[in-house]
Amino acid sequence: MASQLTDAFARKFYYLRLSITDVCNFRCTYCLPDGYKPSGVTNKGFLTVDEIRRVTRAFASLGTEKVRLTGGEPSLRRDFTDIIAAVRENDAIRQIAVTTNGYRLERDVANWRDAGLTGINVSVDSLDARQFHAITGQDKFNQVMAGIDAAFEAGFEKVKVNTVLMRDVNHHQLDTFLNWIQHRPIQLRFIELMETGEGSELFRKHHISGQVLRDELLRRGWIHQLRQRSDGPAQVFCHPDYAGEIGLIMPYEKDFCTTCNRLRVSSIGKLHLCLFGEGGVNLRDLLEDDIQQQALEARISAALREKKQTHFLHQNNTGITQNLSYIGG
């Protein structure tokens, strides 16, 4: 199905990132170093299963093929498995993925797969247990690793692992990561540290361009792969001697926004056209009843006409994003 979600720059949007909570139990240095602080929204204030069913149905009707459930930590919701099943009800949604810190992966991943989950991204910023603890504030490295193993045992053929690239923290550990994925079908995605409203000092101290890793990968014979239309923003590299892949997400690179194919809805029902945009368009008043779907689709389509051509990170403008738990990164 061709996407009806096309902006003024002829970009088509097949991919929805849907945040279902901003609560997280980790305290990652680059996101929530002081831990989660409620913003006035209680658990009852987040989108309900019925609201999630309606918003994903509207996006699917407009051509969305992939939904990624994000947070916060989405698995902290007690109804998380029900949420997966609600999204799965729509046959037009071909891929349902989650980005998780892995805290509940070992316990619940088989149930998530049975409910319809097709993809998993796990955040792992270091393969050293002590450094993992220092970055996340949680001594859960072995638990997260066991969760990744459990995902393969549950039938997932590939697991994606997100690693925030930080100077003097993990940027020099490429060989360790490559050894880890040599015999494992893991797509390891290095994500450039991004500046947020609360993270400017950390950014100045630890940002390093992903170009450094790309040059090294190409030097070692890694091959750049072509993107599919519902893929995320990663540049993916493969090597004949490795079961795993490497992905690089470099938001500061020239023309990064040219291939944008994703929209975001926050855990309180606001449509965000860009991770680093302003404001957001309220959808929640149109999520109360199934009969509102046509009006909901019209509002989404109208909002898309206002999407900017690019973010303004190069001008140190991080928009409304104070931290990455706010609308799910």
UniProtKB/Swiss-Prot annotation:
Assembly and interaction partners: Monomer and homodimer.
Q: What does this protein do?
A: Catalyzes the cyclization of GTP to (8S)-3',8-cyclo-7,8-dihydroguanosine 5'-triphosphate.
Which reactions does this protein catalyse? GTP + AH2 + S-adenosyl-L-methionine = (8S)-3',8-cyclo-7,8-dihydroguanosine 5'-triphosphate + 5'-deoxyadenosine + L-methionine + A + H(+)
Q: Which CDD domains match?
A: Radical_SAM, Twitch_MoaA
Q: Report what the protein is called.
A: GTP 3',8-cyclase
Q: Radical SAM core domain spans which residues?
A: 8-234
Kindly list the cofactors needed.
[4Fe-4S] cluster
Q: Name one GO biological process term.
A: Mo-molybdopterin cofactor biosynthetic process
Q: How is the cofactor bound?
A: Binds 2 [4Fe-4S] clusters. Binds 1 [4Fe-4S] cluster coordinated with 3 cysteines and an exchangeable S-adenosyl-L-methionine and 1 [4Fe-4S] cluster coordinated with 3 cysteines and the GTP-derived substrate.
Instruction: Identify the EC number(s).
Output: 4.1.99.22
Binding positions for [4Fe-4S] cluster 2?
257, 260, 274
| Organism (species) | Escherichia coli O127:H6 (strain E2348/69 / EPEC)
**Enzyme's top EC category:** lyase
| Pathway annotation | Cofactor biosynthesis; molybdopterin biosynthesis
Q: Where does [4Fe-4S] cluster 1 bind?
A: 24, 28, 31
- Kindly indicate whether the keyword RNA-binding belongs to this entry: no
- Please provide the record's keywords in A-Z order: 4Fe-4S, GTP-binding, Iron, Iron-sulfur, Lyase, Metal-binding, Molybdenum cofactor biosynthesis, Nucleotide-binding, S-adenosyl-L-methionine
